[in-house]
A protein has these predicted regions:
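Extended low-complexity, serine/threonine- and proline-enriched intrinsically disordered segments
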Residues: 22-28, 94-101
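Core alpha-helical transmembrane segments of integral membrane proteins
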Residues: 163-200
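An acidic-aromatic loop/edge-strand motif
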Residues: 115-176
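Solvent-exposed beta-strand/loop surfaces of large extracellular or lumenal domains
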Residues: 41-51, 56-60, 102-122
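Hydrophobic residues positioned within well-ordered beta-strands of beta-sheet architectures
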Residues: 22, 71-73, 86, 122-124, ...
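Extended carbohydrate-recognition surfaces in non-catalytic/accessory domains of CAZymes
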Residues: 1-81
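Solvent-exposed loop and beta-edge segments used for protein-protein assembly and interaction
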Residues: 16, 65-69, 78-80, 87-91, ...
Length: 200
């Protein structure tokens, strides 16, 4: 269903993490707050799968890749209130996040008159049930990418913490493997160079 993601108890059980990639309402060139949606004054939206495009142009050569845009997604959660976590990867290059009507956080300043970029990851925990509207206003004038290019991760606090810990562990293993490969390459290069010097 367009604009709504249904999350059942089964979807949120155990260590399950839901990646919020699909069904986003996307409003390029607009900075809509929850009040605008409540008043039904929004126009010009389209549906978007995050990661399909790297900037606000949506692949069109006639549209600007930088600028501002609003993202909107509705979550349909179980009726029993629970504490959830929303993990936001890098959003380029400044944004404000609303949950329902509440302004929850900002990274940098997406306001066009006071734009300031600040890129970083963010984890938000909140208690909710039923319908939750996620509204994100993003602005970019300083990076090759624009807006939300990586889907947020959603789940219970425990599930998100385990997901982030696993990511960190894998990143650490990868860096260690790269370092070990580089050290071995340097060792064999020096060994080969030394042997060649002895031959000649």
């Amino acid at each position: 269903m367009g604009g709504v993601m249904f999350c059942s108890d089964a979807d949120l059980s155990g260590d399950s993490v839901i990646f919020l990639a699909h069904q986003w309402n996307f409003f390029p060139g607009k900075q809509y707050t929850p009040s605008d949606f409540n008043e039904k004054s929004v126009t010009g939206g389209t549906f978007l799968t995050l990661g399909s495009f790297g900037n606000f142009s949506l692949g069109s050569t006639s549209e600007a890749s930088n600028g501002t845009a609003t993202y909107r997604l509705t979550l349909s959660l179980p009726d029993t209130a629970r504490t959830y976590s929303l993990y936001l990867p890098e959003i380029f290059s400044a944004y404000t996040l609303y949950l329902n009507e509440e302004k929850v956080c900002s990274q940098g300043n997406p306001d066009l008159a006071h734009y300031k970029d600040l890129i970083g990851n963010k984890e938000i925990s909140f208690t909710a049930s039923g319908t939750v509207h996620i509204t994100i206003i993003a602005t970019n004038y300083s990076h090759i990418y624009s807006g939300i290019t990586y889907p947020p991760a959603f789940g219970t606090v425990t599930a998100i913490q385990k997901y982030l810990s696993t990511r960190l562990f894998i990143s650490g293993i990868t860096l260690a493997a790269i370092f070990l490969f580089g050290a071995c390459s340097l060792f064999f290069f020096c060994r080969l160079k030394h042997n060649n010097a002895l031959v000649f």
